[in-house]
From Swiss-Prot:
This is Hexose transport activator protein. The gene is AHT1. Residues 46-65 are annotated as: Disordered. Multicopy expression suppresses glucose-uptake defects in various yeast mutants. It comes from Saccharomyces cerevisiae (strain ATCC 204508 / S288c) (Baker's yeast).
Amino acid sequence: MDCKIKAAGKNSGIFHEGGTKSSKSFLTVFIRSVFPLSPSFPAGGGIWGPMEKKPGGVGKKKGSEKKTAQGNIFFSTERDAGQEKCGILYKHCFSILYGFFWKKADKPKEKTGNGSGLGIVFPIGQKKIPEPADSDIFLPCFRYAAASDFTKAKRFLVEITAVYWVSLEAQPSSASCLFILI
């Protein structure tokens, strides 16, 4: 596994060291490392939420449906005495981790330079994407992701090497979501 987790004080960082990995293995490493005692995470099970049926898109036969994986993992901030060692992360870094979901680029490979365009968004705390005025390292990645320009988003992540979770308590107006391209 070419992904390592660092958790220290009020900030927890996710380091990308190159290579490829499945979204499932990446999230398994992340969730098991940061939330080792969370009862919301199925022990030994998968991390994808229930499949949600949606109407078929253009070119689909009438009545056909397609399924999309929906992340449906929720972590409560209330922990019992046996889970105190996770408290600092819940309190300072992740007041509530609302879940995750994935999306694919709308543009074809020849335009984006990225075949899969698979990304994961972790909304944290307030459900708000930062305004352009906010000075935060996440912003370029958010703009690229919003424009489906996954090549630039991926290059941005490679350039900064590490993507940090920002403490909502220390910087309440900072990023409340984190986009990771894999």
